[in-house]
Amino acid sequence: MAQYECSEHMENFLRELPKCEHHVHLEGTLEPSLLFKLAKRNNITLPETFPKTVEECNDRYNRFADLQDFLDHYYIGMGVLITENDFYDLAMDYFTKAHSDGCLHSEVFFDPQGHVERNIDIDVVVQGFNRACKDANTKYGTTNKLIMCLLRHLPAENGLQTIHSASKYYQDGIIHGLGLDSSEKPFPPNLFTECYAHIKDNFPEVGLTAHAGEEGDHTFVSDALNLLKVSRIDHGVNSHQSEELMQRLAEQKTLLSLCPLSNVKLQVVKDVKELPIDKFFQMNVPFSINSDDPAYFGGYILDNYKAVHTRFGFTKDQWKIIALNGIKGSWCDDQRKNELISLVEEVYKKYNIEGC
């Protein structure tokens, strides 16, 4: 993979700049070291073809052929997560790393169907992740929210059953959003209209988002907006194929949760510079920069910020706008948004006073 480096001053600015992460899969933060630790702890035998060491894992993760190749490894890794403490440890490791990168608000995905089909109760999953959210909030002064994703390669009926089984967590405000992930092209948004309608009708305060326009074309984005009634699009890089869609995203202030290093790792593009990030900026399409599955793609949120800066050379003024758009597009309350906005202003002022 290409190297992305920037000046020490700019890296410090980007590190301190308060960030919101809207697109990270907790199962995708499973570092090889924790994967092997949990496999041993839970007496899990990994497939014979799976890498045997941390080094071999990292090497294999550097050679994903496409989205499906990654997903095959992703689901194997998921298999070592068994107990509530496993899910807690996984999430706390992520929150600790994200905080060190200057991430103050996270809205994190998890895939309950991938665990339930392994006979792991959804309560084990949610309670482990929720406990980590609470502990991270207390320890780091951050805010963290859970978004339950449906796996689009599974039948929509299964997704609806999963929503019903998670209803109490939506009711209690423990799960804050609904998302849609996994293989995109064979499973378009129209398959999941009933799932999204159920959430919208029964829990209107819950945020709706969906992966769209990563491998699928711009019509996947339009369909997610029109049919699923989402207020956010995950990835959405192919939105640039339609000027009409771009104008709509800008006018409606629909946030795209971009994942630059993920797009390179999964062969969507060869280099971050090929992404239409500058076009999104020029056309006032709001976006945030995110890590997606950092344990598999070799970069957490700061790494993605650095990669974008290296390739597009955004000024501190432009980075301030990106940070503010991320805050405004978050599903936290106005008080928290105002706190984060003030912190962005403080960091921006600090680095401008330094005169660089």
UniProtKB/Swiss-Prot annotation:
The record describes the protein's role as: Catalyzes the hydrolytic deamination of adenine to hypoxanthine. Plays an important role in the purine salvage pathway and in nitrogen catabolism.
SUPFAM superfamilies on file: Metallo-dependent hydrolases
Q: Which InterPro entries match?
A: A/AMP_deam_AS, A_deaminase_dom, ADE, Ado/ade_deaminase, Metal_Hydrolase
In the Enzyme Commission scheme, what number(s) does this protein have?
Answer: 3.5.4.2
A Pfam family: A_deaminase
Ligand binding (Zn(2+)): H23, H25, H211, D292
Residues involved in substrate binding = D293
Question: Which residue positions does UniProt flag as site: Important for catalytic activity?
Answer: H235
Biological process according to GO: adenine catabolic process; hypoxanthine salvage; nucleotide metabolic process; purine ribonucleoside monophosphate biosynthetic process
Give the location in the cell. Cytoplasm; Nucleus
List, alphabetically, the GO terms of the cellular component aspect. Answer: cytoplasm; nucleus
Is Nucleus set as a keyword in this record?
yes
Where is this protein primarily located?
cytoplasm
Q: What does the note under cofactor report?
A: Binds 1 zinc ion per subunit.
Q: Which cofactor does it need?
A: Zn(2+)
* Location of the active site: E214
Q: Which reaction does it catalyse?
A: adenine + H2O + H(+) = hypoxanthine + NH4(+)
Molecular function GO terms recorded: adenine deaminase activity; zinc ion binding
- Descriptive protein name: Adenine deaminase
> What UniProt keywords apply to this chain's record, in alphabetical order?
Cytoplasm, Hydrolase, Metal-binding, Nucleotide metabolism, Nucleus, Zinc
UniProt lists the family membership as follows:
Belongs to the metallo-dependent hydrolases superfamily. Adenosine and AMP deaminases family. Adenine deaminase type 2 subfamily.
